[in-house]
Amino acid sequence: MASSGVTRRDPLANKVAIVTASTDGIGLAIARRLAQDGAHVVISSRKQQNVDRAVAALQAEGLSVTGTVCHVGKAEDRERLVATALNLHGGIDILVSNAAVNPFFGKLMDVTEEVWDKILDINVKAMALMTKAVVPEMEKRGGGSVVIVASIAAFNPFSGLGPYNVSKTALVGLTKNLALELAAQNIRVNCLAPGLIKTSFSKALWEDKAQEENIIQKLRIRRLGKPEECAGIVSFLCSEDASYITGETVVVAGGAPSRL
């Protein structure tokens, strides 16, 4: 069927969205786009000053955004984040799980148990537990949408980032399993896998110009991505336009190889 050519505004009107790790980079861009598309957004970060700065900036743009401190690895922080959304807006329709850490660079055989625990706790376990925390609230609303932020490293691992790569591959599996289990509750679960997006989190991979150029030469689109180029995809996945999509991973990586 051909498009009518009519642009629909505010596809997320009056939806309530939680976005973790959303005061900078990809998370901030996602929070901004969801709010621009009509959602009431609750952002979070581990540091209060970062939350305050991001909330002030987004509210200055006329967007419905509030925020709270949340370390996703702490149960009490996850509970507070959910409670903030409920107290302010009465429910939760959307969760975007973006939090991740990467405290290690080197060979897999040199990774300590402590590093493995930290990466898997934050990058994988906390994602599952954050979803668990919001599902009962989504059920009360008749359904919802979860977007898990992984990485192209799930398919095409970065050298020296073994534990991080493994954690992101695990998120693709988590997405598929959550989608399978939550479909009956009308909760869709999808995954975003960004390539090398120019953010402070990925700075170690692009601050050296020679290294950046080497990466760019492997891309079909010969440049690094921008956070905003991830945000629209997430908004789409959370909207009714994606109502028949679940368990999928969308790669936003400039054409970099991205299959297992």
UniProtKB/Swiss-Prot annotation:
Extent of motif Peroxisomal targeting signal: 258-260
InterPro entries: NAD(P)-bd_dom_sf, Sc_DH/Rdtase_CS, SDR_fam
Active site: 164
Residues where substrate binds: 151
Cellular component terms per the entry's GO annotation: mitochondrion; peroxisome
Residues reported to bind NADP(+): 18-42, 168
Primary role: NADPH-dependent oxidoreductase which catalyzes the reduction of a variety of compounds bearing carbonyl groups including ketosteroids, alpha-dicarbonyl compounds, aldehydes, aromatic ketones and quinones. Reduces all-trans-retinal and 9-cis retinal. Reduces 3-ketosteroids and benzil into 3alpha-hydroxysteroids and S-benzoin, respectively, in contrast to the stereoselectivity of primates DHRS4s which produce 3beta-hydroxysteroids and R-benzoin. In the reverse reaction, catalyze the NADP-dependent oxidation of 3alpha-hydroxysteroids and alcohol, but with much lower efficiency.
Protein family (similarity comment): Belongs to the short-chain dehydrogenases/reductases (SDR) family.
Additional remark text: Primate DHRS4s display different stereoselectivity and catalytic efficiency in the oxidoreduction of some substrates as compared to other mammal DHRS4s due to a difference in conserved amino acid residues.
The protein, known as: Dehydrogenase/reductase SDR family member 4
UniProt organism field: Oryctolagus cuniculus
Taxonomic path: Eukaryota, Metazoa, Chordata, Craniata, Vertebrata
